[in-house]
Amino acid sequence: MCRGCRKCHETAECSILDDTKKLMAEYEWADKIVSVSPSYWADIPGQFKVFIDRCTPWCNTHEPHAKISGGKKGYTIALRTGPSMPECEKIIGSIEHFYGHLEIEASGKLGLCKVEHKEDVAARTEEIQEFCEGICRN
């Protein structure tokens, strides 16, 4: 969890030794990044937020900052149990905000409401496949 020490604002590196660098190496390797998030009280889960906070060394709002290579495309899928698409849009907005600070182009999004059980996802297979095929085409 980010401690707010701001060392990364001076060195572009974090003082915490965990797997964040390994995960960011995967981001560096990838051309396309797909983030999928359920709704936890109308936003991304705490674990996802902790990861985003830990990516501060790569955030383009301060210099120096670590960088991943450009030209990456980011896609987002948000799921929630309720019927309100604005809640999915809030989740998508949080993830696209994260992408923006890593200079990843937000290139597609899918919000899935009324998803509580596996069967609810299975009923949306065609919609999900179309979204995934779009990722492959772009």
Locate the predicted segments by residue.
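N-terminal beta1-alpha1-beta2 submodule of the flavodoxin-like/Rossmannoid cofactor-binding fold
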Residues: M1-N60, G100, S107-N138
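Short, glycine-/small-residue-rich phosphate/pyrophosphate-handling segment
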Residues: E63-G108
